[in-house]
Regions:
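The conserved Walker
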Residues: 178
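Conserved pre-motif I regulatory segment
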Residues: 69-175
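Motif I (Walker A/P-loop) of helicase-class P-loop NTPases
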Residues: 183-194
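Conserved tryptophan-centered aromatic signature that marks the ligand-binding surface of SH3
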Residues: 618
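Helicase-associated low-complexity regulatory tails and linkers flanking the ATPase motor
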Residues: 1-75, 101, 118-120, 125-129, ...
């Protein structure tokens, strides 16, 4: 029986008006108290190594076996419950990765932070459905401890939260960094929720399963992801069609929800009921229109349950308040209306009674208090600082050209040339070492430009086109700048008078003599200089313009909402050419193709949310990030994603990098800003998260001299063949068929004997029976008839064995369907 959770341990108090949001996650704190030394760092120390990833032969995860040693708090939950949670997680994970594993020809294993996210979810949902009052009491004990830690001064008390009520329990949020697998987490959460909701009745479903996305494009992307995870019932929401079957996942973008029915919108009342709602990029609704969105969110989930996912909750709630502050604001508005003052201290008791909040206003305050709402509902925090500290994702190099320098055309084009050379260096290294880089799963580099304005005189997209045209039209000047940059001649200095591109292009020292010509070939898809940039209006696609040099294959793509306005502006520009193509198809969906010849993608802010690609290696940001903390991190997250060696998602360490590959250049995201005020904001964000910005890191290389002893050190060595990867390892020597025992092992292996016991295990007490005269082991035993076995679905059995073989890594086992049938039907195997 589970006992009442203990309260949180006291932590160091802070006296700033607002705590770091990481320290306000009450639900997250509560979940960690299920574990001894319950912190993310403590669990990472136990589960963070690669050897704990995967499934044990008993069907449990290797994480479970490590947790069950001595780490788990047995006074809160016993081992059997942990075992049950783990089996559920393994089953759900295998279900959503089955198709992906076959597609990628690999096995996707959970990372420790993914496993903990899912384990926390299992515990929470079990308590939510089966011990709701106990869950409420435990959370309020934790919240009381949190409030006690913030009770020293008035500023501290401004960080306090009100007690949980039952209506607070039906929402969970995940603060996970971009690239940490939020989509897979979302899919498993659907299966987890349905497991507890159905409670064995597989025909029982919520009224609706709704997946909310930031825009229509991402809705379509989610459909593809659902298919890859093996879901069969899903569709884009269409209000003109009849209601789908129960259990169908309806995908709709958040912009189509409104308070009333419209031509392109649907009233949120149409979705009211016992719904399961999943909200991708949950920060979207906490901006300027937060009030309206939070009310709609409440209507959608009031009688159901919600999961939310975002990488930027911290930035999104930066301006949010707790419930008490929102209630005070409501009272001030009422006081202003009734008594023409907002000073509540000047009101007497009778006047205060007139501005007392109604139950509906109190409920609205709980809905609007975004900082408290998410502080009490974020189940797991694996935001960027933890993601980076664990070695996941790319390093970053962030530069910005200030507005004064940008006013000078020559300085701007010189800066852009350096950006282009940085991207070319990545292209050059990738193409030169493609085979060696395959081990590290490096994708073909892609240069992404993101602008704040699309049309008008100050169009950022147009500015990028003018630079590309300049580079093609001014070969001599471009060559001179490229030569200076490679030779470390100081051309662009930082505020400390340092050459910001010093030693940035060492990998190009041995590059082709005519780098400009190689840039034309690799980046612009042309072998002839002197040709002009051409903008192609792809009439057959929506919002796309292609970029090419002369008649060469397109090298770039513009993907924006208002393509006609931009194209009209291009028609008035004499520095490059333009042309209509009435029959061209969309190119955007080809960006992630292995053989894609598109090297540059230019777009607007929509790239900040959800667009997925492993290719992004260099970013150019124009007029971006002014006061938009969430967008800054979203933009950054687009580029730091990395598959890594063995799909580890991690960047390589210096000791792992082969010499001469300059792998660190390809595992670094170059971010170049122009008039982008995000620079100071983002740098401050990194420092607040405990990450040292790249411009403050000084690398010191110390030469080492080997001083090996004359006699070699004697070490113990395993016999060749003990491990699979050795020359005489079993997998390298033996290739048995299904159910075949190699001749060398005949007589050394016990014959398998399988017994399935279907008797229920019950404890009984019968007062009418005296003594212990119950017969022991009197059971009815039977064997399956071969005729029954012949009716088995052997296709399904065959595929299950193939999946198990893949999961266990038995690459040397030969699986034959007919041999499986012969074995099961009792035929002699030759």
């Amino acid at each position: 029986m589970a006992k009442k959770p203990t309260t949180g341990k006291a932590v160091k108090k802070e006296t700033n008006s607002k705590l770091s949001f990481h320290k306000q996650l009450v639900l997250n704190r509560f979940m960690f108290h299920f574990f001894k030394d319950g912190t993310l760092q403590g669990l990472k120390n136990r589960l963070g190594e690669d050897r704990f990833e995967g499934i044990h032969e008993d069907g449990q995860s290797l994480f479970f076996h490590e947790l069950s040693n001595y780490l788990f708090e047995v006074d809160l939950i016993d081992l059997d419950e942990l075992r049950r949670y783990d089996l559920n997680i393994v089953q759900h994970w295998q279900q959503i990765t089955e198709h992906r594993n076959r597609k990628e020809d690999t096995v996707l294993n959970m990372k420790y932070f993914q496993y903990l996210s899912l384990l926390f979810t299992e515990i929470y949902l079990d308590w939510y459905f089966n011990r709701k009052q106990q869950l409420l009491d435990g959370l309020n004990n934790e919240l009381a401890a949190y409030n006690a830690e913030n009770d020293k001064t008035a500023k501290d008390r401004a960080n306090q939260f009100k007690s949980y009520i039952l209506d607070d329990l039906n929402k969970l949020a995940y603060w996970n960094a971009t690239g940490s697998g939020k989509t897979l987490l979302l899919h498993v959460n659907i299966l987890q929720y349905l497991h507890y909701f159905q409670n064995g009745n597989t025909h029982h479903y919520p009224d609706k399963i709704i997946l909310l996305t930031p825009d229509e494009r991402l809705s379509k992307q989610h459909l593809d992801e659902l298919e890859n995870s093996g879901f069969t019932q899903y569709q884009l929401f269409d209000k003109s069609k009849s209601a789908p079957f129960k259990g169908t996942i309806e995908v709709i973008d958040i912009n189509k929800l409104a308070d009333e029915m419209g031509d392109k919108t649907v009233a949120v009342e149409a979705f009211e009921g016992n719904n399961l709602v999943l909200i991708d990029e949950g920060h979207k609704g906490t901006g300027s229109a937060a009030g309206a969105w939070m009310r709609r969110r409440d209507k959608l989930t009031r009688d159901g349950f919600a999961f939310e996912y975002s990488a930027t909750f911290g930035q999104a709630v930066a301006g949010g308040n707790n419930v008490e502050a929102v209630e005070t604001e409501i009272q001030k508005k009422k006081a202003k209306l009734l008594f023409e003052t907002t000073a509540l201290g000047k009101l007497n008791e009778e006047e205060l009674a007139q501005i007392a909040l109604t139950s509906e206003e109190k409920r609205d305050a709980r809905i609007q208090a975004t900082r408290e709402v998410y502080g009490k509902s974020i189940l797991f925090d694996y935001s960027y600082k933890f993601f980076y500290e664990d070695g996941y994702g790319k390093e970053s190099l962030i530069l910005n050209l200030n507005p004064e320098e940008d006013k000078k055309d020559e300085r701007r084009y010189e800066y852009f040339t350096a950006c282009l050379l940085s991207f070319y260096q990545q292209q050059y290294l990738f193409n030169k070492n493609k085979e060696k880089l395959s081990e590290f799963n490096i994708e073909k580099p892609l240069w992404v430009f993101v602008g704040n304005t699309v049309s008008g005189e100050d169009s950022d997209i147009h500015a990028v086109l003018r630079f590309l045209a300049w580079f093609l039209n001014h070969e001599t000047q471009a060559k001179a700048w490229i030569n200076d940059l490679i030779k470390n001649k100081a051309r662009i200095l930082d505020t400390k008078e340092r050459n910001i591109f010093e030693n940035r292009f060492t990998a190009l020292m041995n590059a082709p003599e005519d780098i400009y010509a190689d840039i034309l070939s690799r980046l612009f898809n042309t072998t002839h200089s002197g040709q002009r940039l051409r903008v192609l209006n792809l009439i057959g696609s929506k919002g796309e313009l292609a970029l090419q040099v002369g008649e060469a294959e397109p090298f770039g793509l513009i993907n924006i909402g208002d393509a006609p306005s931009l194209y009209k502006m291009c028609e008035e520009d004499t520095t490059f050419d333009y042309q209509r193509d009435d029959f061209a198809k969309s190119l955007f969906h080809t960006l992630n193709d292995k053989d894609s010849r598109l090297h540059i993608l230019i777009g607007s802010r929509k790239f900040t949310e959800g667009w997925s690609s492993w290719r992004v290696s260099t970013m150019g940001l124009l007029n971006m990030g002014r006061g938009e903390g969430s967008q800054i991190i979203q933009l950054f997250g687009r580029g730091v994603r990395l598959k890594g060696r063995n799909y580890s998602l991690k960047r390589s360490t210096p000791g792992e990098r082969p010499k001469g590959l300059h792998l660190e250049k390809l595992e670094t995201l170059n971010v170049f800003g122009v008039r982008a005020d995000y620079m100071a904001t983002f740098k401050q964000y990194l420092e607040d998260e405990g990450i040292t910005p790249s411009d403050e890191i000084l690398e010191l290389n110390f030469e080492t001299r080997p001083n090996m002893p004359a006699t070699r050190l004697k070490t113990l060595k395993l016999k060749d063949g003990y491990k699979d990867n050795q020359r005489l390892g079993f997998k390298r020597v033996y290739f048995p068929e299904l159910y075949e025992v190699p001749a060398d092992f005949q007589g050394k292996i016990k014959q398998p004997h399988i017994k399935l016991d279907l008797y229920p295990k019950l404890e009984s007490i019968d007062t009418s029976r005296k003594g212990d005269n119950t017969p022991v082991n009197v059971r009815n035993e039977a064997k399956l008839d071969y005729k029954i076995i012949s009716a088995f679905d052997f296709d399904r059995l065959y595929l299950a064995i193939q999946n198990y073989k893949l999961q266990r890594g038995w690459s040397n086992l030969r699986v034959d369907k007919q041999r499986l049938i012969d074995f099961c039907t009792g035929k002699r195997l030759c």
